[in-house]
């Protein structure tokens, strides 16, 4: 688990050793995202391929373009499964094992890998942590480049992320954020479901939910507090009581986030 796993070239093209020999097989032992909507026109599909290939040296485009075109056809997205790391376990490792120049960067690397841990993530190989579309990155190239930047970053630099795309390391100072993240920066007039599907398929926008694209997913515990307050206020408003003692609370919410409902109900006194 060394720095070579995250090394990138200064041109921002991925080191060929990262992907040339990697597996192309889809792992059947984990859940996978459903096929996304086929919404792109033919010119837009060409643009999606161009956007995906920007991460690679031009010499490799002829090899990768057909493969990425097949992913776009089969899955509705270009995930770059070839680049999924298989030489180390995807999980939150002890912070001192990360090849980083500052501890904050190591912590962020740890958080990213926790979000992509198969035990944690909903569709880990499609980089979806929760909610069906809560993405950490849009593709595995972005993962490698971001981890490479984090391994190089000092406490006088800030990494800027735009919907999974690493814009680069910028000079800052120790009191500045180590990472500035935006996801789904779209104005309301262009934010329909089809707009999202199109822009995500093009590789120019992603939906990071609240804690997937910000690298800090902690499951239902992250919303237990707010859910408890909501349940208590519902009791006050509709039942004219201060808690749910003696009330049977029925919910189908038992998933990664909605599981907070059962916990909140118990905290509020329900049975």
Predicted feature residues:
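N-terminal ligand-binding/catalytic initiation module
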Residues: 1-226, 236-242
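Glycine-rich phosphate/ribose-binding loops and adjacent secondary-structure elements
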Residues: 213-271
């Amino acid at each position: 688990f060394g720095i070579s796993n995250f090394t990138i070239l200064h041109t921002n093209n991925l080191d060929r050793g990262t992907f040339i020999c990697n597996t192309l097989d889809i792992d059947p032992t984990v859940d996978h995202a459903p096929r996304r909507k086929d919404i792109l026109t033919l010119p837009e599909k060409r643009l999606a391929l161009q956007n995906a290939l920007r991460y690679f040296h031009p010499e490799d485009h002829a090899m990768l373009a057909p493969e990425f075109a097949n992913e776009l056809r089969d899955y509705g997205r270009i995930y770059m499964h070839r680049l999924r790391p298989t030489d180390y376990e995807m999980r939150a490792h002890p912070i001192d094992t990360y090849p980083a120049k500052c501890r904050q960067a190591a912590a962020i690397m740890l958080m990213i890998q926790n979000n992509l841990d198969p035990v944690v993530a909903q569709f880990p190989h499609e980089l979806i942590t929760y909610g069906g579309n809560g993405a950490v990155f849009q593709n595995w190239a972005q993962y490698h480049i971001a981890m490479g930047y984090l391994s190089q970053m000092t406490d006088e630099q800030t990494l800027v992320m735009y919907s999974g795309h690493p814009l680069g390391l910028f000079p800052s100072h120790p009191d500045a954020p180590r990472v500035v993240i935006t996801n789904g920066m779209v104005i309301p007039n262009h934010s329909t479901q089809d707009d999202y599907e199109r822009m995500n398929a093009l590789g120019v926008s992603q939906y990071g939910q609240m804690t997937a694209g910000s690298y800090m997913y902690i499951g239902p515990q992250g919303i237990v507090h707010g859910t408890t307050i909501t349940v208590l206020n519902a009791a006050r408003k509709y039942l004219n009581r201060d808690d749910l003692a003696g009330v049977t609370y029925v919910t189908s919410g038992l998933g990664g986030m909605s599981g907070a409902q059962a916990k909140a109900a118990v905290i509020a006194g329900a049975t």
